[in-house]
């Protein structure tokens, strides 16, 4: 019996200018790419054309919905904005329902402070569960987001973050 690679897209959950989460998403995406037996795609919600005059499944984005339906699991990279998650991410997530059922999801929180997005993860978990996603035990926490990467977008403390991502991805898959 032939096995296919697991498809685990990474979703960058913010569209703000100057977003520090973009480098985190690229780092996480790179870590998934290094894993044997995995395929991935980086989905940036900034590039999705979602109308804002409706809600829920009425505004499904065909490509996003197809990608989520095909996925074996998901990784969300989410910045912490005043202890919460970006409204646009919630708007995008609400556009699908059946596509999420029983899929594993891991969340990487990003924050300027020292908690590594823990508070955004705490606030997002009930939403993910309500959507039918199965949340994993380990989180990806990225503290001090503005200082994590050098001017070329490379993570400074590669060893520490690679170890954390190895644990995170091991739990997810």
Residue ranges: model-predicted function:
Residues 1-96, 155-173:
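N-terminal beta1-alpha1-beta2 submodule of the flavodoxin-like/Rossmannoid cofactor-binding fold
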């Amino acid at each position: 019996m032939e096995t296919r690679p697991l498809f685990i897209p990474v979703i960058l959950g913010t569209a703000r200018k100057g977003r520090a989460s973009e480098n985190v998403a690229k780092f996480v995406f790179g870590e998934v790419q290094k894993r044997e037996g995995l395929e991935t795609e980086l989905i940036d919600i900034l590039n999705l054309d979602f109308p804002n005059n409706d809600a829920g499944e009425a505004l499904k984005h065909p490509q996003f919905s197809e990608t989520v339906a095909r996925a074996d699991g998901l990784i969300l990279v989410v910045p912490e904005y005043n202890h919460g998650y970006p409204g646009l991410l919630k708007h995008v997530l609400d556009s699908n329902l059946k596509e999420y059922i029983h899929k594993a999801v891991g969340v990487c929180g990003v924050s300027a402070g020292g908690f590594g997005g823990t508070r955004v993860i705490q606030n997002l978990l009930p939403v993910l569960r309500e959507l039918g996603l199965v949340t994993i035990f380990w989180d990806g926490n990225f503290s001090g987001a503005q200082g994590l990467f050098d001017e070329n977008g490379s993570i400074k403390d590669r060893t520490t973050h690679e170890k954390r991502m190895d644990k995170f991805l091991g739990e997810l898959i």
